[in-house]
């Protein structure tokens, strides 16, 4: 994907959505605290069941060398190699039970995902990009970052300014090729049903 590219949508959506993508290469440019907090602010205003807000984050900025290196080690290979070029690594953590009754929260992961989407779209609006990774060592992450019982480490997001320059190494060329690849999403008719599973939804087959 290049700087002037946008995601091709069937229907008009927000520019932050059409401009969002997941880089493998980042510029050696710090992410300011203000910009990072804007992204986290967007995340915390996501909706959640019972307003439970089951989301938590652990942040490591690249200039915080020791913390950043620890967060890099929480990743699985090959994510470590490219994610280490980002300005920020952000671990998302989910509380698994509801605050008001201490019962399991069956939609905690949904709510954390919604907050994560808010964060990624706010980043896109600011000229940043976010690459979210499920490839983390959860047991190592839990132990190293002292995550207590009742909380689950979920993903680590690489946040920064995407590098769209000419690659200098073979590995960099491979990452650049991934970035330049066309992006596709399945059609609405294949994932939106009407009435019952597999039944065509008239709303997505007829344009009003």
Predicted regions and their residues:
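Acidic, surface-exposed loops and disordered segments
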Residues: 1-208
